[in-house]
Amino acid sequence: MTEHHMDVQADATQSASESKAMAAPKGKFSEAEEGFLSTSPDSANGDAQQAHTHTHIISHTHSKGAAKTQTQTQNGNGTLGMGLGAPMLPGGSRQLLRQAFYQCSCPEQCVTLNNILDSFKAPLSEDQAWALIYQFGSLYYKVAAQAHKSGGDYEADLPSRFELHFHRDGNVHFSGAERLPELVESQEQEASQQEQQQKQPQMDDSATSSVDSNAALDRAFDNNNHEHHHHHHHQHHHPVDSNAALDRAHHTPLVVSHRKIISEMAEIVYTALDYNLPEDEECQMSQELENLFNFMTADETDEDCIDEGIDEGDKRWDDEAEEERNDTKELEHIIETCRNHLQKPALADNHYKAVCRALATETIELRVFLQQVLNNGAEKLIKAAESSPTTQKELAKLGFNDWARFWVQVIDELRRGVRLKKSNFERTPIEYELTPYEILMGDIRAKKYQLRKVMVNGDIPPRVKKDAHAMILEFIRSRPPLKKASERQLGPPRMCTPTPREQLMESIRQGKELKQITPPEAPPLRQRMLPSANSTLSRSRQRLIKVDFSQLQDDELFFDDSSMSSSHSTAATHQHHQQHQPHHAHLAELHRCSQPKMPPYPFGGYMVPSQARQECQATATQLRPRRTMDTSAPRQTLPQPQAQARPPPPAEPSFTEDEYHRFFDNALESYDLATQCESRRASLRRHTIVGCQSNLEETHSMPPTRPESRQSDDAGSQSQSGASSEAPGIRKSPLMEGDHSQTTDGPPRLDEAHSTSSLGPWNKSFMDKQTWMERGDDRLSVTLAEIVHIRSVMTKAELEGLPMDVRVKEDVEKRRVCFLCLRTRFSFFGPWGIQCKLCQRTVCAKCYTKMRIPSEHFRNVPLVLISPSLLSSPASSSTPSPSHHAHQAHSSSTGNIMDDQFPKSLIERLLRSESDRKTRSTVGSAPSSPKHQRSNMSTPGISVGPGAGASTSAAPGHAVEALHDQAAMSASYSSAMRPSGVMQHHQKHHYNNAMSRSMEGPRSLPVHSPAYRPLSNSSTLERKSRFSRGFALFSSGSHLAQTQDQKENLRGEQVPVCNDCQGLVNEITSSVKQKRSSARNRTIQNLTLDLTPVWK
């Protein structure tokens, strides 16, 4: 115990010589008393120890009384003193505390925490709070650890209230609080007495601490004595024994807790975070920082202190080492928490030091900036303030806080890299960062890692010295030898089903090669005239020639002649035509050879009475040798006796006319007269050129077995008969007949050229056989609803073709103008438009009619009738349709009106006369229906009588057909009501009149066409059904009204349709009727085709 007390006494003497006393302000003492509570184990040792300790403190305080003024001058805030790097004396704990807490090496580069908060007028950030706690904890931990090792009483020198200081280099230190003023004088006296007694040299001024630090140290010792030993407080100023003081100084630092310092540090940091915030607003912080604050401000437990009234004896000296180790555990926990807050704990020292350095630097630079603003712009601001009262108010508002806020914004932008002005920016070189693999390989090459050796089968494998190719070959050689390809046995191939595409391609590859057939050439004139005389034709060539036996007889000349003299109604006139029949047959044959080929008009067959058949047989028997002689001889007109005197050609096996008809009667008993060959009918086959390409084979009502070269018509004689009509009873003289035969028997090329040129460009295009054959066999089975839909689509398409410049399209779309005539304009007061039930067009009263549509389903409708191609001309879009051919001359006279922007169909509609618009009914370029032409009864030059034929003028027209139809109907109805004798006469006249009209061609042909026949009305089947219906109605008697009602129900309800749709329905109806006999016609064709080589 004696040696130990001597060591403590020596340490106390040395520390007392180094300590400095200073005055502390009044009012701080009461706050500092509870800051450092010491529970010394020697609290009950006596008053002597306390008195000695107090005397020791006074001596140190008095020694520093003279240096007070000098210290305050050097450091304005009381922190200037010995530097941090000053050497620590061995065993001197007070010197260590002064270096850490009270002394600053460079006060110009140091700012306090209060200065930072006042400069920015803003609280600290969370990162800055973490840095402050870490820097304080690290510094205090070093001081506490070194003080324990030195064994000095460092706890007594710690201040209760201290202030934080930041250096520009990132370091921190602290300054203590001031002492109470009433204790300054007494402590100075005690310090001077102690200095005189010990006579120790004073320390240099450069190493002295500040007045505040000395006062804090003296107050700390005095605080410890008065707080923990208050029952000896009256003995402070009395001298005590030195041995008791040594024992007291030895035991004090072992029992004082560090929690008071840590708690006060937490309060300072939290106050900085809550600086300048409203009272009702709490600072925002993370949960981790909040937990750290709770740990730093936790209350002390009973385990951290020792009760004063318990005498533990010698045991407390045995636990001295353990208490010293446990004193710094709180600091270690705080430092570790701050390190774990970062992603890289190893860089915590550098990071937190950089944060403190930035905070101090920004504050110092702000101060320099504000000082420059004050020095340079003070005069200007004063002058501006004096001149304008508004400026004074603005300057008053613009206080220090605004400048600080501006400075913070500038610093923040600079930290983020904002450019202050534009500069020539040059891109820095691209820095390529290595991949992790490259970094690992570089570290391996630099031998930063020590690789472990890998053992293979208990041994380290040797280095591979062979290349990859050699290793592959070695591996192949080590394997079993391969077999030859010829010795290998492969399994059966897997059966795979070919795809549809592969099957299609395979069928194409294996397809049969078709035999190449040269295109047929036009037969020469000799072969066309004599197809059966050429015995060198091949079988395939003969199949291409369609034989029609009706052309081998010229029975049609009888009806041609009767059409020229249709007004003759007596039997003498009829015999006159029979006598002159051979001469006209010769003329008809010449004209037939000179006319071009034309496709047949697709209307049904005709029913012929037996009288006409007998006349036709007789005529054919007389004309057969004449035709053979005329066609085989050179083309020149010979007298009739010479022609009959020529020897006939060599006899060949052939059928006579009677045998031929007898064969058909036996083979086709079930067919009616309409399905038999035309040589047994009274009417001629019609020739026409229509706009809708129909099927040649299916729409024929006669067997098309006649050679195509003879499918022409007697147009020359017909045009003559139409041009010069003879009065009844007048006959031609032989001279006139001879002149007529010589005139018509001219050069064939001239006649052919003349007849072809008269057809016009549109008609020529439809004489092409290939065009008719390709597009003639397309048929559909449609319903009435589908036809309505097709017509509506075609209406929209035709509407798109209207021009937009003349407002025609707009008026038609808004249903202001008639769709067909484009002339009648509708209004609210009238006239009103009528909507067609089929095409939904709005037409005027002149362009619509009411008709009955009895069927809801139509079979075998030709596609050409409902196709959009009917809207334009078949040849080209710039040529008019055949129904418009009559207006070609008038349209061409309009000049430039038919240019590209106005369709010709539109121009034809606009230029069409009103009477023609009433009678016209076409669908595109399809043939017009004759049903609407019977209302015009005022055509001049036509007279209809009940017993005499009508004489026509040279100008034919549509009204002629209507009048003849009306005359026929009148005659048929009146004949049923007359006596039998008179009825027979009228029936004979009606028969001749009907047969004369049956030879007429369709009225849809142009006027100048060779096949044009002006008195055409409809097909024979339609006339037959009309006549039979008329007779049935008159023969019904009393059941006439009932039959009429039943037929009205069968015929259907009348619906308003436009003229175009009515023509379409009529054409569809007639085409369907013609389709019914097409199968029988095919059978007849197949039966008669093989008779071509034997029939002449």
Swiss-Prot record:
> What are this entry's molecular-function GO terms?
actin binding; microtubule binding
- Span list, region Disordered: 1-79, 184-211, 560-588, 614-656, 693-762, 874-899, 912-958, 997-1021
Protein topology in the membrane: Peripheral membrane protein
According to its record, what are the GO cellular component terms? cell cortex; cytoplasmic vesicle membrane; cytoskeleton; perinuclear region of cytoplasm; plasma membrane
Per the database entry, which stretches of residues form a coiled coil?
315-340
Here the segments flagged for biased composition (Basic residues) are 53-65, 574-585
- Read off the PROSITE patterns from this record: KIND, WH2
Q: Which residues form the WH2 domain?
A: 436-454, 500-517
- Give residue ranges for domain KIND: 111-366
What keyword terms does UniProt attach to this protein? Actin-binding, Cell membrane, Coiled coil, Cytoplasm, Cytoplasmic vesicle, Cytoskeleton, Developmental protein, Membrane, Phosphoprotein, Protein transport, Repeat, Transport
Tell me the Pfam families matching this sequence. KIND
Comp. bias regions, Polar residues: 37-51, 921-941
Region Spir-box, annotated ranges: 780-800
Q: How does it assemble?
A: Interacts with bsk, Rho1, Rac1, Cdc42 and wash. Interacts with capu.
State the family it belongs to. Answer: Belongs to the spire family.
Q: What is known of its domains?
A: Binds to actin monomers via the WH2 domain. The Spir-box targets binding to intracellular membrane structures.
Role: Acts as an actin nucleation factor, remains associated with the slow-growing pointed end of the new filament. Promotes dissociation of capu from the barbed end of actin filaments. Involved in intracellular vesicle transport along actin fibers, providing a novel link between actin cytoskeleton dynamics and intracellular transport. Required for localization of determinants within the developing oocyte to the posterior pole and to the dorsal anterior corner. Links Rho family signaling and Jnk function to the actin cytoskeleton.
| Name listed for the protein in its UniProt record | Protein spire
Which species? Drosophila pseudoobscura pseudoobscura (Fruit fly)
* Source organism phylogeny: Eukaryota, Metazoa, Ecdysozoa, Arthropoda, Hexapoda
> What gene name does this entry carry?
spir
